[in-house]
């Protein structure tokens, strides 16, 4: 599972008997959430995020930074296509209020060292992708393919 999908897969693994759960750009417990997410949980400030700006923000970034960024933005739009505001509000609530106290035992956690969504400062027991950000699954697919070929075969 990637990002929020990592949380979902860990919850699914409590229902089915998974041998391993692989998460990328995610967290293994609420202790690993960013300090801003922990603050948002306590204050409920996440309820006031204006998520409708996402599409307009992407268009602004593409306009300001040019074709190279526009290509990257289009890639994100293709692979990160769930943008419904109700879904985003719901998923942020589920992430911020996740009640997983301790990591489950069978998790393989791969994480970029430059991830700003889930910064590594709070993470333990993960496989680092140097200079990888939250979108390592898109930007570092070669590294991931090589890792999986060597370690999961």
Across the structure, where does each feature detected by a protein language model lie?
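Flexible "cap/lid" loop of the alpha/beta hydrolase fold
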Residues: 15-50
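Short, hydrophobic alpha-helical segments
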Residues: 148-153
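Short, hydrophobic alpha-helix immediately C-terminal to the catalytic nucleophile
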Residues: 9-14, 145-146
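Short beta-strand/loop motif that positions the catalytic acidic residue
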Residues: 109-111, 115
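Conserved alpha/beta-hydrolase catalytic His-Asp/Glu region
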Residues: 53-100
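Catalytic histidine-centered segment of alpha/beta-hydrolase-like enzymes
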Residues: 132-147
């Amino acid at each position: 599972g990637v990002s929020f999908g990592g949380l979902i897969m860990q919850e699914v693994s409590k229902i089915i008997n998974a041998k391993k759960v692989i998460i990328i750009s995610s967290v293994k417990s609420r202790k690993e959430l960013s300090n801003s997410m922990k603050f948002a949980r306590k204050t409920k400030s996440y309820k006031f995020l204006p998520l409708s700006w996402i599409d307009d923000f992407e268009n602004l970034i593409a306009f300001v930074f040019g074709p190279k960024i526009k290509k990257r933005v289009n890639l994100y739009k293709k692979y990160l296509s769930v943008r419904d505001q109700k879904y985003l509000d719901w998923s942020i609530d589920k992430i911020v209020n996740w009640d997983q106290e301790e990591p489950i035992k069978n998790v393989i956690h791969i994480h970029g060292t430059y991830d700003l969504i889930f910064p590594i400062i709070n993470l333990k027991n993960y496989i680092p992708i140097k200079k990888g950000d939250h979108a390592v699954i898109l930007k570092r697919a070669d590294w991931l393919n090589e890792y999986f070929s060597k370690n999961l075969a």
